[in-house]
């Protein structure tokens, strides 16, 4: 959803994100988008009937709910890399440990990671202090350049788009448990990363100033 009228805060946050996406790739200063979504685990109550030359695979309409999981999507759009972490919950502590993995495992040699994310209340520096001692929390805070999409501007977060691809290519069927979910996502992730599939993003600040002119204050 885009605001219907002039909104200086929206365009300021939007341009900050767009300028980040316009940067040339630099491994010392990677751009990383993060988003998350819940997932429902569903078990079959009857064994599906395999496909035949005359019929596709047939699945009974009944299923059994088997809990939920949370998916953290991390997507580096300039290099075509993504990583999905499956957790039981989506607390501040879960979020903090995902950031620690980014900083220390996936991008240990980066000087600063430009982190683009939505304005969820857990997506904050404070979450690191809930999970780690102060010195460690501060170290991790300083590894990131914290950027937020504007309110009603989650479409600017490329991790949201990548979650959409994941949902359509991998999560479009019943997945019975967390272990199966992790395995299915890992296979999808491996294929996407092997092909270095990047974001097909062409929206720039100059584009925004023309197409979204109504959002800019009249001066």
State the predicted function of each range.
Residues 3-6, 45, 180-219:
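C-terminal domain-tail junction helix/linker
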Residues 13-100, 212:
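Extended, low-complexity cationic-aromatic segments
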Residues 33-35, 74, 80, 99, ...:
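Mobile genetic element proteins and their domesticated derivatives, centered on retroelements
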Residues 43-44, 124-130:
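A short acidic (Asp/Glu
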Residues 58-64, 136-158, 174-176:
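RNase H-like polynucleotidyl transferase catalytic core
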Residues 93-114:
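Short, basic/hydrophobic alpha-helical segments
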Residues 110-124:
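Acidic/histidine-rich, metal-coordinating catalytic segments
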Residues 159-178, 191-195:
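Active-site proximal helix-loop segment of RNase H-like, two-metal nucleases, encompassing DDE(D)
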